[in-house]
């Protein structure tokens, strides 16, 4: 019973029958111009701690932006808390990990019968926009301006120089 060893996934689903969006795990969506997300309860706190640690390490001259991009020792500092938080999978937040998902932890967004443009996405887009092109541009701007993700947008991970993002990305846009 070690959740940190389990494969986990997030999922966002549109139910045509129920006219609902179901959010399991950390994902996000746009319904028209309305933004919805479903972050893990302590994700922002962990991101803030990582950002503070990165700023401290750089202020003390122990690390640089470049060195942190290669080996993120600020992330290393929060790994124990991230692992500890995994004990709460499908208790305080929902994920797909092979165990029962508590229905009350699935975020449900009901839709009326108006026509809607819907965007469903993973949390790999720090700034979700109404088109994939705009979302990718915002991601590229984030990478250029703050590759460590410790400024305006804070994350538990930085961009890695050999990868094109800091997290998984999925995006779909459709109309109902």
Positions of predicted regions on the chain:
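Catalytic core of PPM/PP2C metal-dependent serine/threonine phosphatase domains
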Residues: 1-30, 66-111, 174
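C-terminal catalytic subdomain
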Residues: 77-176
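Surface-exposed beta-loop interaction hotspot
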Residues: 30-85
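Serine/threonine-rich low-complexity intrinsically disordered regions
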Residues: 15, 41-42, 64, 71-72, ...
């Amino acid at each position: 019973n070690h959740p940190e060893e389990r494969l986990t996934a997030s999922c966002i689903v549109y139910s045509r029958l129920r006219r609902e969006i179901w959010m399991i795990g950390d994902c996000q969506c746009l319904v028209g111009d309305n933004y919805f997300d479903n972050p893990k309860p302590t994700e922002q706190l962990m991101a803030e701690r990582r950002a503070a640690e990165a700023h401290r390490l750089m202020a003390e001259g122990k690390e640089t932006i470049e060195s942190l991009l290669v080996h993120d020792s600020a992330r290393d500092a929060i790994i124990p808390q991230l692992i500890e938080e995994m004990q709460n999978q499908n208790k305080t937040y929902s994920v797909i990990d092979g165990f029962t998902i508590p229905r009350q932890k699935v975020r449900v967004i009901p839709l009326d019968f108006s026509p809607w443009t819907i965007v469903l996405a993973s949390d790999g887009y720090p700034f979700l926009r109404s088109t994939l092109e705009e979302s990718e541009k915002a991601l590229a701007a984030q990478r250029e301006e703050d590759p460590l993700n410790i400024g305006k947008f804070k994350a538990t991970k930085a961009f890695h120089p050999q990868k094109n993002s800091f997290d998984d990305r999925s995006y779909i846009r459709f109309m109902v």
